[in-house]
Amino acid sequence: MQESSTPLNQEVSSSRRNWLKNTALAGVAALAAPVIDASAKSAAPAPAARRIPLAVSTYSYWHFEEKKYPIEKVIEDAARLGFDGVEILHRQMTDESIPYMNKLKRLAFDNGLSLPMLSIHQSFVQPKAEDRKKDVAHTIRCINLAVQMGIPAIRMNTGSWRTVKRDAAYYKDGKEPAIQGYTDQDAIKWCIDSYGECLVAAEKAGVVLAIENHWGLSSNIDYLLEIYKPLSSSPAMGMNVDTGNFVGNPYPQFERLAPYATIVQAKTYYGGGFFYDLDLDYQKVADILRKANFKGYISLEMEGKENPATAVPKSLELFRKVFS
């Protein structure tokens, strides 16, 4: 007996016909498609290596002399020379007015330059809580300045006991005894607590606080990492590694810090250093940064006595050679 053709059977039959039709078309398309040789895939060009961006700090033109060198001129010079950005030293700013900060931001934008970091000073190595609070407030104020200028990072210090004179002997060993009645471990705790307060504001503002090996307590790399690591889970915590601020052989210490680096300040000393003189092997520095897969800014701090008009271009030429 022949079964009647039900709607379900008709639907199944139609589905089979469509499936067979689609399968046949797919087969034809597969036959018509070009054959790709496996060797052709492997021969595809590798992506071009990304060039590390180079900035110049306004500090390169002004080493705390009485008369400030205008930041506007640094921005214009940086654009002419071919830098990618300008790091602003807070103490070099004429004032903190909104019109002045907007002027710097617009000038950098018009010249195709970024402003990657605002370098500020503070010390949390102070026994009195009220003194540390003042520097926390100063840091938070500077976070707001960075936001106004569109700057994504702030250079941070730990501070120091200030129990020894900053002379040639100090820069050789970096040793500084604690104030009587206190220890370096006390200072480390003060730094962690103070940074924690600052990070609350930094996270809200979207500004990175980049702790630097900037003498004082941070001359000891173990201490620096002891402060950094408990705070590193914060999205606003970073590290600024300065090539010229190491005691003794810089390269093993630089290698320890390179994996944590958010930004790097690279010093040159043409004409002899203002405070001390180092002969840094920048090819070795570049190799360490490549090994650490560093991709951030390298900011020139020309700290030599030679005229910046000649020393800054020399430094840029050196950096282009080793970091490109």
Task: Put a short name on every predicted segment.
Residues 2-34, 39-55, 62-81, 218-324:
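Histidine-acidic metal/acid-base catalytic patches
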Residues 24-33, 107-114, 125-238:
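Active-site acidic/histidine proton-transfer and metal-coordination neighborhood
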Residues 44-46, 75, 100-110, 140-152, ...:
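Short amphipathic alpha-helices and their capping/turn segments at secondary-structure boundaries
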Residues 46-61, 117-123, 168-175:
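N-terminal small/glycine-rich loop or linker at the start of catalytic domains
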Residues 56, 78, 86, 108, ...:
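Conserved, mostly hydrophobic/aromatic
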Residues 56-60, 88-92, 117-122, 156-158, ...:
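A cross-domain feature marking catalytic cores of carbohydrate-active enzymes
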Residues 70-73, 100-103, 132-139, 192, ...:
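Charged helix-capping and loop-helix junction motifs
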Residues 87-105, 161, 165:
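Glycine-rich, proline-tolerant flexible connector loops at the mouths of alpha/beta enzymes
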